C-alpha cells in the first residue's frame, strides 16, 4: 500500500480549477457588498495606510485614540440620520445623505415636543425649511396684496420685513421654493393647528380689507393720506411681534434649536430688562385702546389716550382685550374673515408686541368697564355684508388716560425723596436712653421673676453690643441712623402694599413703623405707637381682670401725656407694651439668640397682642365690675360677663336695656371687614396671634431693626 493510500486522499490543488474558484469568489464578494450593512462598509473605508503601502483596518484602540479628529455635534440631525441613530452634521444635505445619494430628501428630523411647546404649531418649530416658508410666503403675500390694491394704500395689515435670520438658520435660495410649495404653505388648512392671532389691526372709518374689496371707501382722501403716512411710519418690523429685528434679538447667540424657543427667551429677557425703562406716555397705551360707537362697529377717536384725535389701534394678542372677546358667541366668525392673513406669520406667542405699560388701575376706574369692547348680535351680518355697511360718524368718547390713573395712585409715593433722609439726619439716635426707658418700664410692669428672665436675656447680648459699638465715633453713629431711616423708608412702602398686620421697631423695642392693618387689629393708632399722641392704654393683660388695669406688680398708671426723654424727643411705645407677660419674656429670650446669631434667621411662634383700651373704653363695656351698663346706674353685667350689644340695647340675662353711650358692636359670630377685625379680643383685651419676626442688621453688623408680621388666630 502506498503512502498516499495510507494517509488518505490528497488535498485539492489550489491552482486547479482556478477559473471556477475565481468566479465563485467574485460572486460572493458582490453579494457581500449588496447585503453588507453600511456601517461595516464605513469601518472598512476607515482604514489606515501602512508604510509599505498596505492597508490595515482600524482597531478598537485606534477608534478611541484621543488624537483622532472628533466630529462636531450637530444641533439637529436630519430625518435619515435620526432614524438610523447615526451622527449627523449641521450642513444640509449632510455628508451621509450625499454618500447614500439621498441628498434631495435630506431635511431636519422631527423632535419630540416639550410640554410647554404642545400648544405651538409644528411650523413654528422648524428652523430651516418651514421657518423660511413662513417668512418668504408672508413676504410674497404682502407684496401681492400691496400691488393688487394699487393706489389704495390703506390696509389692515402692516407688511413685515423679509428676514431670513441668516445668523441662525442655514441659508436657502429663494429660487429653490416652487410656486406650489408657496401656495401650500400659505393655505391655513394645511397646518394642523392654528396659532393665536397677534397681528396689529388699524381700525379706521375707511379701512379696506386686502383679501376682498367689497367694502368701498367713501371718506375724503385726506384720511387716506394720513393712513398712508401712518403705515409708512409704523410699518414693517415696528408692529410685527414675530420679527426678531423688532427687539434686536440675536437668535444665533441664544443657542436654541428652534425659532419658537429663541423668540420666547428673547421676549422674556426684553420684558425683564425693559420693565422699568418705559416712561409713562400716551403712546404706551395706544396698543390697548379700543372704542366703539352705538352701532357696534369700531370707530376712531375712542381710544383712552390723552389725544382724542390719535389714530386708534388695537392688538388681537392683547390679553386685556382677548379676555372680553373670549365670551362672545361670534368670535370665531369674526376671526375667520381674515384668517388667511393671520396664519401666514410664524407667531411666537409674544406676550406683548408693543410698548408695555405696567400701570394697574382700580377695577372701578378701568377703561374697559366704561367702554365695553364687545360685539352685538348684528356683528356677523355686518361683516358678511360689507357692501351695505357705511362708515358711521365718529362719536366723542370720554377720554381716560392710563398714565393719569397711574399718576393718581403713585403721586404720594413720588413725592417722597430718599435724599431728604441724608439731609435731615444730623444727630445720632440715643439708644442708651431707649434702653434705660425700657428697663424702667419692665421693672414697673412685670413681676420679679419675669423681670429676672428678661434681664438675663439682655445681659447675654450686652457684651456683643459693647464690642461692636466701642470703636464707633459720632460720624459712624450718624451714618448708622441714616442707614436705619433709609431702610425704614423702603419698609414703609412694603407695609403699605402688604395686607398683613406689620410693625417695625428698633433694637430697643421702640415702635418705628406700623401698618394700618395692625391698628385695625389691636386698636393702637399709629400716632400713639410712634409717640406723637398720649398713650392712655390701661390694658396690660393682668390676671386679676380682663381690663381692670392691674398687673402682677399692682396697678399700672398710664401715661398721662406724651413722655419726653432727656434727649428732647417723644417716647414711642415699646414692643413690651403690646404683648402679654409671657409673650414678652419669650420674645426677649428668642431675641438674645437671634440678635448676633443667624443673620437670615427668623422666629415663628404664637403670642397674645393687647388691645388698646382706655378708661373710657372700660366704662363703656358692660360686664366689667367698674363699668356702667345703662343710664339708670344699674349694672348690665350678666352672670358670665357675656353681654351682646345690638342696636343700642344691652341684652343681659334675657332682658334688653337701653344704653346711654355708644357701644362697640361685638359678638362670637362671623368676622367681616374692619369691624369684624376690631371685635377680636374685645372681651378679654387679648388677641391670640401667630407671628413671624426677623432681625435686620446694619453695615456694622449690629441689630438695627426688628420686622414683625402678625396673623390672628380665628
Swiss-Prot record:
<dbReference type="GO" id="GO:0000977">
    <property type="term" value="F:RNA polymerase II transcription regulatory region sequence-specific DNA binding"/>
</dbReference>
<keyword id="KW-0479">Metal-binding</keyword>
<comment type="function">
    <text>Transcription factor which regulates nonfermentable carbon utilization. Activator of gluconeogenetic genes.</text>
</comment>
<dbReference type="Pfam" id="PF24990">
    <property type="entry name" value="PAS_13"/>
</dbReference>
<feature type="DNA-binding region" description="Zn(2)-C6 fungal-type">
    <location>
        <begin position="78"/>
        <end position="106"/>
    </location>
</feature>
<dbReference type="InterPro" id="IPR036864">
    <property type="entry name" value="Zn2-C6_fun-type_DNA-bd_sf"/>
</dbReference>
<feature type="region of interest" description="Disordered">
    <location>
        <begin position="539"/>
        <end position="567"/>
    </location>
</feature>
<dbReference type="InterPro" id="IPR001138">
    <property type="entry name" value="Zn2Cys6_DnaBD"/>
</dbReference>
<feature type="compositionally biased region" description="Polar residues">
    <location>
        <begin position="191"/>
        <end position="228"/>
    </location>
</feature>
<protein>
    <recommendedName>
        <fullName>Transcription activator of gluconeogenesis UREG_00958</fullName>
    </recommendedName>
</protein>
<keyword id="KW-0539">Nucleus</keyword>
<dbReference type="GO" id="GO:0006094">
    <property type="term" value="P:gluconeogenesis"/>
</dbReference>
<keyword id="KW-0804">Transcription</keyword>
<feature type="region of interest" description="Disordered">
    <location>
        <begin position="1"/>
        <end position="71"/>
    </location>
</feature>
<dbReference type="InterPro" id="IPR056751">
    <property type="entry name" value="PAS_13"/>
</dbReference>
<feature type="region of interest" description="Disordered">
    <location>
        <begin position="176"/>
        <end position="228"/>
    </location>
</feature>
<keyword id="KW-0805">Transcription regulation</keyword>
<dbReference type="InterPro" id="IPR050335">
    <property type="entry name" value="ERT1_acuK_gluconeogen_tf"/>
</dbReference>
<keyword id="KW-0238">DNA-binding</keyword>
<dbReference type="GO" id="GO:0000981">
    <property type="term" value="F:DNA-binding transcription factor activity, RNA polymerase II-specific"/>
</dbReference>
<dbReference type="GO" id="GO:0005634">
    <property type="term" value="C:nucleus"/>
</dbReference>
<feature type="region of interest" description="Disordered">
    <location>
        <begin position="274"/>
        <end position="312"/>
    </location>
</feature>
<keyword id="KW-0010">Activator</keyword>
<dbReference type="GO" id="GO:0008270">
    <property type="term" value="F:zinc ion binding"/>
</dbReference>
<keyword id="KW-0862">Zinc</keyword>
<feature type="compositionally biased region" description="Low complexity">
    <location>
        <begin position="545"/>
        <end position="555"/>
    </location>
</feature>
<dbReference type="GO" id="GO:0009267">
    <property type="term" value="P:cellular response to starvation"/>
</dbReference>
<keyword id="KW-0312">Gluconeogenesis</keyword>
<comment type="similarity">
    <text>Belongs to the ERT1/acuK family.</text>
</comment>
<feature type="compositionally biased region" description="Polar residues">
    <location>
        <begin position="38"/>
        <end position="62"/>
    </location>
</feature>
Amino acid at each position: 500500500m502506498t503512502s498516499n493510500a495510507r494517509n488518505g486522499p490528497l488535498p485539492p490543488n489550489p491552482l486547479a480549477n482556478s477559473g471556477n474558484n475565481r468566479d465563485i469568489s467574485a460572486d460572493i464578494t458582490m453579494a457581500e457588498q449588496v447585503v453588507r450593512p453600511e456601517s461595516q462598509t464605513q469601518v472598512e473605508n476607515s482604514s489606515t495606510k501602512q508604510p509599505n503601502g498596505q492597508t490595515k483596518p482600524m482597531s478598537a484602540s485606534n477608534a478611541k485614540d484621543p488624537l483622532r479628529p472628533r466630529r462636531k455635534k450637530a444641533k439637529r440631525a436630519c430625518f435619515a440620520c435620526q432614524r438610523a441613530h447615526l451622527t449627523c452634521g449641521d450642513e444640509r444635505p449632510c455628508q451621509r445623505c450625499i454618500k447614500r445619494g439621498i441628498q434631495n430628501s435630506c431635511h431636519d428630523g422631527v423632535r419630540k415636543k416639550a410640554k410647554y411647546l404642545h400648544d405651538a404649531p409644528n411650523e413654528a418649530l422648524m428652523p430651516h425649511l418651514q421657518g423660511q416658508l413662513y417668512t418668504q410666503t408672508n413676504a410674497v403675500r404682502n407684496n401681492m396684496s400691496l400691488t393688487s390694491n394699487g393706489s389704495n394704500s390703506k390696509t389692515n395689515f402692516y407688511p413685515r420685513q423679509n428676514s431670513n435670520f441668516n445668523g441662525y438658520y442655514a441659508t436657502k435660495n429663494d429660487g429653490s421654493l416652487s410656486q406650489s410649495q408657496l401656495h401650500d404653505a400659505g393655505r391655513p388648512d394645511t397646518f394642523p393647528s392654528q396659532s393665536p392671532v397677534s397681528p396689529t389691526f388699524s381700525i379706521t372709518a375707511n379701512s379696506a380689507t386686502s383679501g376682498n374689496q367689497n367694502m368701498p371707501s367713501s371718506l375724503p382722501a385726506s384720511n387716506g393720506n394720513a393712513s398712508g403716512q401712518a403705515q409708512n411710519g409704523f410699518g414693517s418690523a415696528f408692529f410685527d411681534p414675530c420679527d426678531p429685528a423688532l427687539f434686536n434679538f440675536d437668535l444665533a447667540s441664544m443657542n436654541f434649536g428652534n425659532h419658537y424657543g429663541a423668540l420666547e427667551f428673547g421676549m422674556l429677557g426684553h420684558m425683564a430688562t425693559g420693565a422699568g425703562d418705559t416712561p409713562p406716555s400716551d403712546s404706551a397705551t395706544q396698543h390697548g385702546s379700543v372704542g366703539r360707537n352705538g352701532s357696534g362697529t369700531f370707530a376712531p377717536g375712542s381710544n383712552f389716550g390723552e389725544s382724542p384725535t390719535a389714530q386708534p389701534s388695537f392688538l388681537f394678542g392683547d390679553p386685556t382685550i382677548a379676555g372680553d372677546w373670549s365670551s362672545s358667541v361670534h368670535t370665531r366668525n369674526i376671526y375667520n374673515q381674515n384668517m388667511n392673513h393671520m396664519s401666514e406669520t410664524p407667531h411666537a406667542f409674544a406676550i406683548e408686541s408693543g410698548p408695555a405699560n405696567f400701570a394697574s388701575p382700580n377695577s372701578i376706574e378701568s377703561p374697559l368697564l366704561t367702554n365695553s369692547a364687545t360685539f352685538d348680535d348684528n356683528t356677523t351680518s355686518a361683516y358678511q355684508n360689507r357692501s351695505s355697511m357705511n362708515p358711521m360718524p365718529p362719536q366723542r368718547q370720554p377720554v381716560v388716560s392710563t398714565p393719569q390713573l397711574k399718576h393718581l395712585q403713585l403721586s404720594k409715593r413720588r413725592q417722597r425723596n430718599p435724599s431728604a433722609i441724608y439731609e435731615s439726619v444730623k444727630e445720632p439716635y440715643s439708644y442708651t436712653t431707649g434702653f434705660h426707658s425700657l428697663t424702667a418700664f419692665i421693672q414697673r410692669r412685670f413681676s420679679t421673676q419675669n423681670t429676672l428672665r428678661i434681664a438675663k436675656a439682655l445681659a447675654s447680648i450686652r457684651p456683643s453690643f459693647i464690642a461692636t459699638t466701642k470703636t464707633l465715633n459720632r460720624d459712624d453713629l450718624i451714618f448708622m441712623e441714616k442707614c436705619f431711616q433709609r431702610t425704614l423708608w423702603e419698609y414703609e412702602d412694603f407695609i403699605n402694599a402688604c395686607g398683613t398686620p406689620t410693625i417695625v421697631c428698633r433694637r430697643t423695642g421702640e415702635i418705628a413703623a406700623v401698618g394700618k392693618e395692625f391698628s385695625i387689629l389691636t386698636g393702637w393708632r399709629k400716632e400713639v405707637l410712634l409717640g406723637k399722641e398720649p398713650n392712655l392704654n390701661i390694658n396690660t393683660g393682668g390676671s386679676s381682670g380682663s381690663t381692670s388695669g392691674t398687673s402682677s406688680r399692682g396697678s399700672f398708671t398710664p401715661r398721662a401725656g406724651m413722655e419726653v426723654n432727656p434727649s428732647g424727643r417723644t417716647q414711642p411705645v415699646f414692643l413690651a407694651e403690646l404683648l402679654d407677660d409671657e409673650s414678652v419674656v419669650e420674645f426677649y429670650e428668642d431675641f438674645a439668640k437671634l440678635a448676633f446669631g443667624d443673620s437670615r434667621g427668623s422666629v415663628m411662634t404664637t403670642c397674645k397682642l393687647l388691645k388698646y383700651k382706655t378708661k373710657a373704653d372700660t366704662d363703656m363695656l358692660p360686664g366689667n365690675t367698674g363699668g356702667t351698663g345703662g343710664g339708670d346706674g344699674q349694672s348690665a353685667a350678666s352672670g358670665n360677663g357675656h353681654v351682646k350689644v345690638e342696636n343700642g340695647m344691652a341684652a343681659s340675662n334675657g332682658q334688653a336695656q337701653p344704653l346711654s353711650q355708644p357701644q362697640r358692636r361685638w359678638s362670637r359670630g362671623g368676622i367681616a371687614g374692619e369691624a369684624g377685625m376690631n371685635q377680636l379680643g374685645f372681651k378679654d383685651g387679648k388677641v391670640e396671634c401667630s407671628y413671624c419676626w426677623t432681625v435686620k442688621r446694619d453695615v456694622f453688623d449690629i441689630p438695627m431693626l426688628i420686622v414683625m408680621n402678625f396673623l390672628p388666630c380665628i
